[in-house]
Amino acid sequence: MSAPSESSETAAPLLSDLSPEEQKGVQQVREIYRALLDSFKFKNEYNAYDPLNNTIITQHGSYEVPEAFAQCTYLAQIYVSYKINSLPYQTYIKDLEWISPAEVYKLIMERLQKNKYFLRKQVQAMEKIKVLLCPSPELLENNYVDDNLKISSHKVTQRHPEKVYDLMTYQEIADGIDDFFSLLEMPNLSLAFVNKTSIKLNISCSGANNHIGSFIGRTARTIRHYWIKNAILEFADYKKKTVPYPFVGPPRDPGLFEHIVDDCSTGAPINWDDFSIDSYASYVTVMEHLEEVVELTDRHRRVIEYLGMYIASDLHEEGKLTRARKLDRTTLFHTVRDVLLHDGSYTRHKGVRCLDNGSVRVSIRLKHRQLTATWIELEPIIENGEVKDVMFKLSTRVQYTEENENETRPESSSE
């Protein structure tokens, strides 16, 4: 073995140089770090600390570690990932505003309250997590007075075989989804689920973190926009099949469209006396107002039919609306991917389907061959004209065939 360098006093030893007991401790520390990442929903945003340059390296760029974090670089790493993931899109933060190590430590402890690792191993892990996060407690300046991790209940309701999961508040989302996919990874899946078992996983997105309000509003808006565009295009297709083409716009109904404008908080006043649905400008105006309506009523659905009639007579606008619907569909699929946090576990299958209640259903294909008819329904929860939540309802079914049954059932042993 080569002689240690002058900087080896501060460098971490190689894993192979440690005793079996020490290696076990290192593995526990790695599990704790993984629990930290899971608690913060970091998706693919991971980083590494470069001690030579005192920087944190990410896929978007490097950040110099402040002097206050010199003895607690784990805190700095977690904070950088946390800030990047708080943005709508992962990118480099040019002027990153650092907070004190004590504030980062408090934030982490609050997030760990519901992590499944500490629900199961909290007693053995507490000292390790303190040392991992901050080897020098005096750096915390006594700003974090609650020294005990409060363990919350971790409950999953099971009703076998009709419904397996009925989950959950958003604070438990990471644990619940991890448990769900871990269950599907069992080598002997048929021992847990009988054939044709229905599995349902309901996820509420309310109360996740500081920026969840914008996430709920953005997701509900995408659902609404896709639903409206799809309804208009479907009605246009219907009219082209039932009415001689080219079709001229519908008769004027000022009262109908006045109601739409009254329901919206934005938009300039419109002279409805001169209004005609076959006007391109009025078509655009009605579309803009309609997409701002939070809860669609029967009157709004009638307006959608009028817009569909106009689209049926304008191939150019129909093409533009079709492309816009495709972009919304892609956004919905990416939203599902981000919520499930299991890249590579599934692929898009049959696209998106609109339901009568204003929600949409995204069809996916899980990598587990014994699971069929898998889809996720995205349903906005509206109260008093405001979006309060978005429910993600995953549904799938266990279907054993001769081909995949051998993959899930244990092989019979022969003496």
UniProtKB/Swiss-Prot annotation:
Pfam families: Rep_4 (PF05797). InterPro entries: Rep_fungi (IPR008897). Keywords: Plasmid, Plasmid partition. It comes from the Eukaryota. GO terms for biological process: plasmid partitioning. Plasmid partition require REP1, REP2, and a cis-acting DNA sequence (known as STB). REP1 may act by intercalating in the yeast nuclear matrix and binding STB either directly or via REP2. This is Trans-acting factor B. It comes from Kluyveromyces lactis (Yeast). The lineage of its organism: Eukaryota, Fungi, Dikarya, Ascomycota, Saccharomycotina.
